[in-house]
């Protein structure tokens, strides 16, 4: 009740009561639609590639000065910096998809999307998020997004958001995963098999 009360007071929590209440990546929404989920996740990182199910080939992180702890700049400078760092020397066209943070808020979804458009221009990778299905799980959301990326790579199956239609579908080789925390702390991870 406390966390829901806080999010409601900030006016970021969804007031919809249906199965798809979190409408992340729905750029036509007129109200915030963030919904909480609950999850736990763990992973094992190793410098050795033996028995690895995936490889992290790039890591990026950045922060930005914000006017409040829940805000983000209109072009998500923190995401621009973290994505550029994670992509590194890879060609932009080699990034097949992005699992976006996309919390379901008008500002959060739009600013991250703007950052993606600034980095990739007219050649956007396929975009998705898992929050329409599992809600925002706070600290676990980044790991769940990483898990989604790995599952899509392993199965060569892109899991699309019902609210955003991608124009192309291609073989999945490299997927970028974005996450951001309150206060403008962004992380991007490039993953491949």
Show the residue positions of the predicted features.
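Condensing-enzyme catalytic core mediating Claisen C-C bond formation in acyl metabolism
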Residues: 18-97
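Conserved beta-ketoacyl condensing-enzyme motif
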Residues: 1, 92-110, 120, 174-175
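Extended C-terminal subregions enriched in glycine
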Residues: 131-140
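Conserved beta-strand-centric core segments of catalytic alpha/beta enzyme folds
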Residues: 1-51, 139-193
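Beta-strand segments within the central parallel beta-sheet cores of soluble alpha/beta enzyme folds
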Residues: 53-60, 93-100, 125-131, 160-167, ...
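Acidic-glycine-rich active-site phosphate/pyrophosphate-binding loop
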Residues: 6-22, 110-127
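Short, catalytically relevant binding-site loops at active-site mouths
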Residues: 61-63, 103-106, 134
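Short glycine/threonine-rich loop-to-helix capping motif typified by GTGT followed
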Residues: 68-75, 104-120, 139-144
């Amino acid at each position: 009740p406390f966390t829901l009360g806080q999010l409601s007071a900030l006016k970021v929590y969804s007031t919809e009561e249906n199965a798809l209440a979190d409408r992340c990546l729905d750029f036509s929404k007129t109200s915030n639609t963030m919904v909480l989920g609950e999850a736990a996740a763990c992973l094992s990182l190793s410098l050795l590639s033996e028995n690895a199910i995936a490889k992290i080939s790039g890591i990026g992180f950045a922060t930005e000065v914000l006017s409040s702890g829940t805000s983000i700049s209109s072009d998500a400078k923190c995401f621009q910096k973290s994505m550029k760092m994670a992509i590194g020397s890879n060609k932009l066209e080699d990034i097949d998809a992005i699992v976006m943070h996309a919390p379901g808020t008008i500002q959060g979804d739009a600013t991250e999307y703007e950052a993606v458009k600034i980095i990739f221009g007219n050649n956007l990778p396929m975009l998705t998020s898992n929050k329409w299905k599992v809600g925002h799980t706070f600290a676990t959301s980044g790991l769940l997004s990483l898990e989604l990326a790995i599952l899509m790579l392993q199965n060569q199956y892109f899991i699309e958001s019902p609210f955003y239609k991608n124009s192309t579908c291609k073989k999945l080789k490299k997927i970028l995963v974005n996450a951001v925390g309150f206060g403008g702390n962004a992380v991007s991870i490039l993953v491949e098999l």
